[in-house]
Amino acid sequence: MFRKWIQAGCLFAAFASSAFAAQETYVVGAGGTYRPFEFENSQKQLEGFDIDIIKAIAKAENFNIKLINTPWEGIFATLGSGDRDIIISGITITDKRKQMVDFSAPYFPAEQSIVVPATSKVTSLASLKDEKVGVVNSSTGDIVVSDVLGKNSTAIKRFDNTPLMLQELFEDGVSAAVGDVGVVKYYIKQHPEKQFKLVPDAKFERQYFGIAVAKGNTELLAKLNSGLKKIIADGTYAKIYNTWFDENVPALPAQ
């Protein structure tokens, strides 16, 4: 009988130890100024597409997270210093950044898109040559449109942010606009009355956002990749995407 109690106690301790290990908490850094990916709500809490994604991954992998609003300037250094375990902040995966951090599998396709009124005849980037086009100043969209129309073209109208640019499109100040696909999709979802549509173009370079961890942290990286695969497979990713953007859920390399 005594041996049975010892065995039972050992089993309980093993289960308790396993449960404790599974509930590890990771500190997550995210910027609070890139709507709809991450931004502060009225309660000063972080929310957005990225925030929902990392929460879903944490749930799928049975770990906890502590979210901290982290300014973009110096965000990568927080991994090296150990102040953050994970950063997710609309970070484009590039070869240069891969030298500093390790990235998860891509979780969002980052590319440009043309935005026009629903009745527009614009069908491609090339067809913007005869149009007045809005871009966000010094953005990727600005670079792309400048290549088509010429950097000093008077047909390019530059704005400080996407909402200003798309309001001008609504008021017929420009015939088309080019911007980050996630940002413009979110705007269109928030303002269906403006009746905009997106026009893709194969010439827009497709890049991807990734979740970053400190160089060499293979254990945490494996958890992130495993969790991402799980939420894609069970439909959680699609639900989150639908909430912030639309029903055209992209295929991802993780699939």
Language-model features, listed with the residues they occupy:
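Hydrophobic residues within well-ordered alpha-helices
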Residues: 57, 79-80, 128, 168-170, ...
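Short helix-initiation/N-cap motifs at beta->coil->alpha
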Residues: 51, 66-77, 157-171, 205
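Flexible hinge/capping segments at coil-to-helix
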Residues: 116-133
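Ligand-binding cleft/hinge of the Venus flytrap
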Residues: 40, 54-63, 141-159, 188-193, ...
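Extracytoplasmic small-molecule ligand-binding "clamshell" domains
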Residues: 22-90, 234
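Beta->alpha turn/N-cap motifs
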Residues: 30-34, 68-73, 82-94, 118, ...
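A ligand-binding cleft/hinge motif common to bilobed small-molecule-binding domains
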Residues: 77, 91-99, 144-147, 171, ...
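Periplasmic-binding protein-like
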Residues: 108-116, 188-225, 229, 247-255
